[in-house]
């Protein structure tokens, strides 16, 4: 375990003892929950992060885009369930606060990931599904905000529909039937689904 919080003692584990999974970076699945453990949940080779910077124009999603750019340069990914960092949760962080316009940059980040993998159709398909899911989640989180409904809702709705079929295919492939049904409902009965979410 590494605790890198300022002023803390650093404790090292001599080796990782749990099972690890080695993945081909050219088959990375952006739709799995593990794909979203993003920048703070990864250890990188120097060769993968060289010349990559966090995007200044993104308030949310900059870490996901950073991870995508690193994976694009990698050949393999090793996934471990070991907790190697203490994660400090800041209740005032930008990701946990109420809606503001900067939250929409998460869609921009996912659009860039889809473009980044334009020449890798398998990976791009999962990125499209991830993008559609992010759009749907924005409506779930901020659908009660009048400001979101004015500023972000049209783009979130269009983004969801643009690649919702890829998302539903991924859900079926992964046997996530409950989520597939929820997505189908929102796909075919969007307006009723939004009103339901606003009433919750």
Outline where the language-model segments fall:
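Membrane-interface aromatic/basic loop that binds lipid-linked glycans or pyrophosphate carriers
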Residues: 144-200
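Short runs of predominantly hydrophobic/aromatic residues within well-ordered alpha helices
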Residues: 67, 106, 110, 128-131
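Gram-positive cell-envelope targeting signals
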Residues: 52, 58, 74, 79-80, ...
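Catalytic core of nucleotide-sugar-dependent glycosyltransferases
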Residues: 82-91, 96-122, 137-138, 142-167
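Donor-binding/catalytic cores of nucleotide-activated saccharide
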Residues: 1-77, 88-101
């Amino acid at each position: 375990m590494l605790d890198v919080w300022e002023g803390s003692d650093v404790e090292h584990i001599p080796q990782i003892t749990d099972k690890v999974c080695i993945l081909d970076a050219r088959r990375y699945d952006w739709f799995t929950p593990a794909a979203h453990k993003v920048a703070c949940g990864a250890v990188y080779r120097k060769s993968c992060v060289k010349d990559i910077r966090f995007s200044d124009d993104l308030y949310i999603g900059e870490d996901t885009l950073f991870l995508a750019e690193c994976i694009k340069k990698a050949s393999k990914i090793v996934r471990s369930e070991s907790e190697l960092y203490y994660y400090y949760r800041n209740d005032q962080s930008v990701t946990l606060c109420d809606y503001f316009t900067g939250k929409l940059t998460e869609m921009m980040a996912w659009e860039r990931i889809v473009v980044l993998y334009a020449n890798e159709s398998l990976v791009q398909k999962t990125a499209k599904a991830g993008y559609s899911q992010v759009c749907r989640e924005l409506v779930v989180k901020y659908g009660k905000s009048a400001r979101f409904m004015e500023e972000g809702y049209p783009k979130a709705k269009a983004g969801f529909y643009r690649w919702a079929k890829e998302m539903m295919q991924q859900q079926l492939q992964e046997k996530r039937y409950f989520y597939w049904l929820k997505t189908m409902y929102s796909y075919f009965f969007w307006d009723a689904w939004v009103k339901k979410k606003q009433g919750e």
